[in-house]
Curated annotation (Swiss-Prot):
GO terms for cellular component: extracellular region. Ca(2+) binds at D256, D259, A261, D263, I265. Glycans are attached at N52, N137, N233, N311, N516. It is an enzyme of class 3 (hydrolase). It is found in: Secreted. This is Probable feruloyl esterase B-2. One of its GO terms (biological process) is xylan catabolic process. SUPFAM superfamilies: alpha/beta-Hydrolases (SSF53474). It comes from the Eukaryota. It catalyses: feruloyl-polysaccharide + H2O = ferulate + polysaccharide. Disulfide bonds join C27-C74, C62-C113, C186-C441, C255-C272, C281-C291, C503-C525.
């Protein structure tokens, strides 16, 4: 190759390098330009793609000391005052390969943890992305104690503040600003997405809200009420994880083939009404490893029953069958659920010594009457969001061990009734996808890889990625008829055993054939 023929390549390389240098230079000087009310910049740094970013200030309970980032980006870390006695920690990640889209991430549990994995995921897809710590640090509810401003941040203010500041910074950093704004969150993040829809309908064009923790106060009470059913691990009513496996296997035996295929996955839990008495140990049985006692059978029946309040009002629907193996270690483990204990101690009763083992349904009434800052997130009239042109795509794993997928079905029904809209009308702006074989936000026995985060990624194509499906809906008007999930052989990044199209509610998946259950085209939404 002659020197002359090298010139175009050198020119191209120089242009690329200049673009990179210009981006780095813009990032280096950006902090000096930020002069927004109540915003205190901690640092601004350029982070090249491939960096394993260390997070020394991340609370140890958040469980993340580092995060690999895939895209070149400008990282802005700041604190934002939300009142005279409260503030949020906020980060904005601005990718060099920017698509003109703004996005806010959410949180989980009671946590004050920036979800760096979601920042990395969405920045890698070209979104200008923000994430906040919800107004406190760590996963404990203790920061709520005698600090109503912190509770208010957690209830709604952290997300909205991050959106307002994040949009301003995005317009400052990119001369083109942004065209559309999105939200991605699951669990508490799902609740935050719906809170934005209900309270700030103009914040987002598209909201992807998974396994939403709305009906929040009753969810807190429902989660702790399992202890009153199971008792401690020395109680006759307690089931060990091994016993729960016996229960789970029997539920799958009874309900698996209702959808037409024997694949270990329950496609529609509404049709599953298991009879647990079938596995009560026979009198005098010497081998009790594959059966349970009558007292334990009553426990299972109560666990799989709706949760009612003191006056007989439904507070929370049943735990959906099929989640037993995942739930046995977190809510059926013979201890009061930790997040619920914290909420009652530090919010409801302002008493760090409150004894969670003494909880009764009367306590649920006290908590619901309190409902600070309407954290319930249970408003069924979302017409303002509809009128603003917003779209919401919500999904919920039907093996969810922490938040019953039946609660998402209940909210869907409440919206339909409150707004007087049937499924066809709701489909214009609100689509709900139950995901068979998916546990809480990720994991599970089935095709849970829907692209709602790094741990479920199976490609960026809209048909394989729930976030990009939302982008296509907002920007091209192509609404998702299904969301495709991938069944991984050994977690994300491993081989895909099969894919399945998860149906839009209220449709359900039925195996029609021909072909194996692993063929997604052998299934039909009816």
């Amino acid at each position: 190759m002659t020197k002359l023929s090298l010139l175009p390549l050198l020119t191209l390389a120089s242009a690329v390098l200049a673009k990179q240098d210009a981006f780095q230079a813009k990032c280096a000087s950006f902090g000096r330009k930020i002069k927004l009310p109540n915003v205190h910049v901690n640092f601004v740094e350029y982070v090249p793609g491939g960096t394993n970013l260390t997070l020394p200030d991340n609370d140890v309970t958040c469980g993340a000391s580092s995060q690999v980032v895939s895209a070149d980006m400008c990282r802005v870390a700041m604190a934002v005052d939300t009142s005279k006695s409260s503030q949020i920690t906020l980060e904005a990640w601005f990718p060099r390969e920017y698509t003109g889209r703004f996005l806010s991430t959410g949180n989980g549990g009671l946590s004050g943890c920036i979800q760096y994995y979601d920042l990395a995921y969405t920045a890698g897809l070209g979104f200008a992305t923000v994430g906040a710590n919800n107004g406190h640090n760590g996963t404990s509810g203790k920061p709520f104690y005698q600090h109503p401003e912190v509770i208010e941040d957690f209830a709604y203010r952290s997300i909205h503040t991050g959106v307002v500041v994040g949009k301003q910074l995005t317009k400052m950093f990119y001369k083109e600003g942004f065209d559309k704004s999105y939200y991605l969150g699951c669990s508490t993040g799902g609740r935050q997405g719906f809170k934005s829809i209900q309270k700030y309908p103009n914040d987002f064009d598209g909201v992807v809200a998974g396994a939403p923790a709305f009906n929040f106060v009753n969810l807190i009470s429902w989660s702790i009420h399992f202890y009153s059913i199971t008792g401690s691990n020395t109680s006759d009513t307690y089931l060990s994880p091994e016993s729960w496996k016996v229960v789970h296997d029997e539920i799958v035996r009874q309900c698996d083939e209702i959808d037409g295929a024997k694949d270990g996955i329950i496609e529609d839990t509404d049709l599953c009404q298991p009879v647990i008495e079938t596995i009560i140990c026979k009198p005098g049985a010497s081998d009790k490893t594959n059966c349970i006692t009558g007292a334990q059978a009553k426990t299972v029946r109560n666990v799989l029953s709706p949760f009612y309040g003191v006056n007989g009002t439904l507070l929370y629907p049943r735990m959906q069958p099929g989640s037993e193996l995942f739930a046995s270690s977190v809510v059926y483990n013979g201890q009061p659920f930790r997040y619920s204990t914290d909420w009652y101690r530090y919010v409801v009763y302002n008493n760090p010594d409150w004894d969670a083992t003494k909880w009764t349904v009367e306590d649920a009434a006290v908590a619901l009457a309190q409902n600070p800052y309407n954290i319930q997130t249970w408003d069924a009239d979302i017409s303002s969001f509809q009128k603003a042109g917003g779209k919401v795509l919500t999904y919920h794993g039907m093996q969810d061990q922490l938040i019953s997928s039946d609660n998402s079905k209940l909210y869907y029904a409440r919206v339909a009734e409150e707004m007087g809209l049937g499924p066809e009308e709701l489909d214009d702006f609100y689509r709900f996808f139950p995901v068979s074989g998916m546990a809480h936000c990720t994991g599970g026995d089935g095709a849970y890889g829907i692209g709602n985060g790094l741990r479920t990624y199976n490609g960026a194509e809209p048909e394989n990625n729930v976030l990009m499906a939302m982008v296509q809906w907002v920007e091209k008007g192509i609404a998702p008829e299904f969301i495709r999930g991938a069944k991984f052989s050994n977690g994300v990044g491993s081989s895909v055993e099969y894919t399945r199209k998860h149906c839009r509610y209220p449709r359900r998946n039925v195996y029609k054939g021909p072909g194996n259950y692993s063929d997604e085209n052998a299934w039909e939404c009816v």
